[in-house]
């Protein structure tokens, strides 16, 4: 079963990654075991997030800076965003907001991966490893 690696860029994900790198450099952990830990982190985060209550939040942005749709994942970068939520109040607008939306149904993810075939998955993996994603640092 595949999981999206969206949450590795969060504070928690970055701290885990840094800790695993430190443990690897000290010889306490192998690279393959660190990779398994990150894969389990991805699965666990996706599972826990799906259990959260589904609350609606409204937002309004003055500008849609960029958008992208790739592999059933939408990514939007918005400028000057005002959030409205029935339970909370937000006093000031957010300068920049990145929204990543993906299909949470695992069957569609697996169908997409199998439809791409192994060569496309490998090419995308090489592109991602080469730093082809320009929006990763805009969180």
From Swiss-Prot:
GO cellular component: transcription factor TFIIA complex
Protein name: Transcription initiation factor IIA small chain homolog
InterPro entries: TFIIA_a-hlx, TFIIA_b-brl, TFIIA_gsu, TFIIA_gsu_C, TFIIA_gsu_N
Gene3D superfamilies for the chain: Transcription factor IIA (TFIIA), beta-barrel domain, Transcription factor IIA gamma subunit, alpha-helical domain
Annotated stretches, region: Disordered: 113-139
UniProt keyword Nucleus, yes or no: yes
The UniProt record lists the keyword Ribonucleoprotein: no
Compartments reported by the entry: Nucleus
GO annotation (BP), single: RNA polymerase II preinitiation complex assembly
Superkingdom assignment: Eukaryota
GO molecular function annotations of the record: RNA polymerase II general transcription initiation factor activity; TBP-class protein binding
Species assigned in the record: Caenorhabditis elegans
Alphabetical keyword list: Nucleus, Transcription, Transcription regulation
PANTHER family documented for this protein: TRANSCRIPTION INITIATION FACTOR IIA SUBUNIT 2
Family from the record: Belongs to the TFIIA subunit 2 family.
């Amino acid at each position: 079963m595949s999981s999206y690696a969206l949450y590795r860029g969060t504070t928690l994900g970055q701290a885990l990654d840094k800790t695993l790198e430190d443990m690897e450099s000290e010889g306490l952990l192998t690279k393959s075991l660190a990779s398994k830990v990150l894969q389990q982190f991805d699965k666990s985060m996706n599972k826990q997030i799906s259990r959260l209550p589904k609350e609606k939040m409204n937002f309004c942005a003055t500008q849609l800076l960029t958008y992208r749709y790739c592999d059933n994942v939408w990514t939007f970068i918005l400028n000057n965003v005002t959030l409205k939520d029935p339970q909370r109040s937000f006093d000031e607008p957010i300068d920049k907001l990145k929204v990543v939306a993906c299909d949470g149904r695992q069957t569609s993810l697996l169908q997409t991966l199998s439809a791409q075939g192994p060569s496309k998955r490998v090419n995308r993996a090489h592109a991602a490893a080469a730093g082809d994603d320009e929006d990763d640092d805009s969180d």
